[in-house]
Amino acid sequence: MTKQPEDWLDDVPGDDVEDEDDEIIWVSKSEIKRDAEELKRLGAELVDLGKNALDKIPLDTDLRDAIELAQRIKKEGRRRQLQLIGKMLRNRDVDPIRQALDKLKNRHNQQVALFHKLEQIRDRLIDDGDDAVAEVLNLWPDADRQQLRSLIRNAKKEKEGNKPPKSARLIFQYLRELAENEG
């Protein structure tokens, strides 16, 4: 009796063991490319950071050296260096790097939001006067009422005389000091 083509498959050596636990997960080529692009973008974000911010991110020495080199390189060499950084990131656990980067971005966003809030309070102090001073004293009991009122009076005079807003800047600086001392 001759073997049929289907029977030939049964005689393959080493095919006797069937491991159901070893399931193969197929990943499309497009998904691999998307992941590589995402890591390259992460590398570009790291390259755009300053030295102080880069020190706050957990990086090994090889990756840090590659990032510092990319910061010094211009044009086409930089593009190639970013590709190398992306390749290096593929072999590393990027979750701690992403978390540290998100933490830096979040801190920056909080600082920007605080500045906007302080600018609104400053503008309200200049426009509303004593009512706004009472609110500031409720927010920051350590605030000096006399100094605030003096700065507000000067800011109003500067605004009416179309002079540079020196006192308005001083009010903002004073409010920022109060906010920093509070937190």
Curated annotation (Swiss-Prot):
Gene3D superfamilies xref list: PSPTO4464-like domains
SUPFAM superfamilies tied to this protein: PSPTO4464-like (SSF158710)
Molecular function as annotated in GO: ribosome binding; rRNA binding
GO cellular component: cytosol
Locations listed in the record: Cytoplasm
Pfam families with a match to the protein in the record: DarP
Highest taxon of source: Bacteria
Entry keyword annotation includes Lipoprotein: no
Keyword Cytoplasm: yes
GO biological process: assembly of large subunit precursor of preribosome
Keywords of this entry: Cytoplasm, Ribosome biogenesis, RNA-binding, rRNA-binding
InterPro entries: DarP, DarP_sf
Reported function: Member of a network of 50S ribosomal subunit biogenesis factors which assembles along the 30S-50S interface, preventing incorrect 23S rRNA structures from forming. Promotes peptidyl transferase center (PTC) maturation.
PANTHER family, sorted: UPF0307 PROTEIN YJGA
Family the entry assigns: Belongs to the DarP family.
Protein's UniProt name: Dual-action ribosomal maturation protein DarP
